[in-house]
UniProtKB/Swiss-Prot annotation:
Protein keywords: Repeat
Gene3D superfamilies noted in UniProt: Regulator of chromosome condensation 1/beta-lactamase-inhibitor protein II
Source species: Dictyostelium discoideum (Social amoeba)
Origin superkingdom: Eukaryota
UniProt xrefs under PROSITE patterns: RCC1_3
Identification of the protein by name: RCC1 repeat-containing protein DDB_G0284033
Length: 487
């Protein structure tokens, strides 16, 4: 909460000046003015010449007020950020650090701006103005160096802690701000750019810093040297020199999208995850050796456990990798686990001729497409309801249109998919979800599989109080990044 002085203008508007953060000795902005309706405050909010702005006040921007982080699902290993006492959470709960010291300054002042979660852990990041660099926090499992610290001596973090290492404290981090933070199953990556650089400009590629850490036994970190795990984040200068705008991660492989629309892959290739048409692992990033990919400009990509989908500039989808569950194209029943496909076009004929694809996604054994008109489609395994289609209506190996709401016509704004759970935000600001809820990943009380979209009222209430701006779904838990309340 923030305190400051106020005066009333025209009996309707409050003028707030010189807002002070209670844990700071200096003004957040010496000449900061806010105009709010006077009916947002009551006498209990005001003491002498000070006032308290509470979380139910609407109409302020996230750059001026603090972000919040919430979690729900299974609390095993402390990955929810609430210690070991919280074994499960159904109603999303705000994550707070009780110790108010310099290490926790960024988290406690609400400056977290990126979140991610792997199989059994959570990571949060924000920019520390005093240290002039991005800082990272984490909780949960650390047996594969997912949380950077300990060098093998700390198996898990039961509570949220600051994650520091020689690389993260080096001068190379100075002035670099986080563009992307992402997790695979047990490995992670981030892209950092100078705050004054144009992230999509090839001329600035040498300014980027691309770090990878965690499990690295299959080469998924991109280092030429073999390490089973990588604690201190590896500075992948090969990717920095190429110029990368996005990274996506599967179970044990990584694919990077360059500024000029090309894909570079490294890691395991048991199912042709790397797209080269073979089963040879790669330790360092290499341009994918495939004519279809080289002939197309790729504008987005997403990796599932062992397959990938990529969106081209002409609104087509390319896909490759494991295909036992028909997530790339139809295969006969009983196809073996070793089934995989080379790079090929996904059949999108069920979409309208002028239906532009605006988002793609991939989870364990599934792929998803969201179009400009608000329709969402799924393909792949439906064993845990991941496709959002009743068993009797599900068609294997082709895109299934998912119907949201009682009439099936509610439009989708964006979606979040990972493992066996999907959550969508609709254009009218509501949340629906389907798939596995065995660990309350959907914030629903009943532990079961949901084959069709269910409205998620716990998330609706959270969104009403504090805007949900990002959700990271893991195997058995979820975390969300939330900003200011809606107007």
């Amino acid at each position: 909460m923030m305190k400051g002085h106020f005066c009333i203008q025209n009996n309707k508007t409050l003028l707030f000046k010189s807002l002070i953060h209670p844990t700071s000795s200096h003004n957040l902005s010496p000449y900061l003015y806010f105009f709010l309706s006077s009916n947002k405050l009551n006498s209990s909010n005001i003491s002498s010449s000070n006032f308290v702005i509470t979380s139910n006040i609407r109409g302020y921007s996230s750059s001026q007020y603090s972000n919040k982080v919430y979690s729900w699902g299974s609390g095993l290993n402390g990955k929810l950020g609430h210690g070991l006492d919280e074994t499960k959470i159904v109603v999303p709960k705000e994550i707070e650090i009780k110790e108010d010291d310099d290490n926790n300054r960024v988290f406690n002042q609400g400056k977290i701006n990126k979140i991610t979660s792997g199989t059994t852990y959570s990571i949060f990041s924000g920019y520390d103005q005093i240290k002039d660099r991005q800082v990272f926090y984490g909780c949960g499992d650390n047996r594969d160096a997912q949380l950077i610290v300990g060098n093998g001596k700390i198996q898990s973090l039961e509570n949220i802690e600051l994650l520091e290492s020689p690389m993260l404290k080096s001068d190379q981090m100075k002035g670099k701000q986080l563009k992307q933070l992402i997790s695979g199953t047990y490995h992670n990556a981030c892209i950092l750019n100078d705050s004054n650089s144009n992230n999509n400009n090839n001329n600035n590629k040498d300014r980027s810093l691309i770090l990878l850490w965690g499990a690295s036994n299959s080469g998924q970190i991109g280092s030429p040297e073999y390490n089973r795990v990588q604690y201190d984040p590896y500075n992948n200068k090969v990717l920095s020199e190429i110029g990368i705008k996005k990274i996506s991660m599967g179970a044990t492989f990584t694919i990077a999208l360059s500024n000029d629309g090309k894909l570079y892959s490294f890691g395991s290739s048991t199912f042709n995850e790397l797209g080269n048409g073979d089963m040879f692992n790669e330790r360092e990033p290499k341009l994918i050796d495939n004519q279809l990919l080289q002939d197309n400009e790729i504008i987005d990509l997403e990796c599932g456990f062992f397959h990938t989908v990529a969106l081209t500039s002409d609104n087509k989808i390319l896909t490759w990798g494991r295909n036992q569950e028909s997530q790339c194209f139809p295969v006969p029943e009983g196809t073996g686990k070793g089934s995989f496909t080379n790079v090929q076009y996904l059949d999108t004929s069920s979409l309208g001729d002028h239906d532009k694809i605006i988002q793609i996604g991939a989870s364990n054994l599934n792929s998803y497409i969201l179009t400009e008109n608000g329709n969402i489609y799924s393909i792949g395994s439906n064993d845990h309801g991941q496709c959002g289609i009743e068993k009797s209506n599900f068609k294997k190996g082709i895109l299934n249109k998912i119907k949201i709401g009682d009439d099936g016509n509610i439009k989708v704004k964006k979606f979040y998919s990972r493992f066996k759970t999907v959550i969508v935000e609709t254009t009218d600001g509501r949340f629906f979800g389907w798939g596995s809820n065995f660990d309350h990943q959907l914030a629903l009380e009943t532990r079961c599989i949901y084959f069709t979209p269910m409205e998620l009222n716990n998330l609706n209430r959270l969104h009403k109080d504090y805007n949900i701006i990002d959700i990271s779904i893991s195997l058995s838990h979820c975390i969300s990044l939330n900003s200011n309340p809606q107007k």
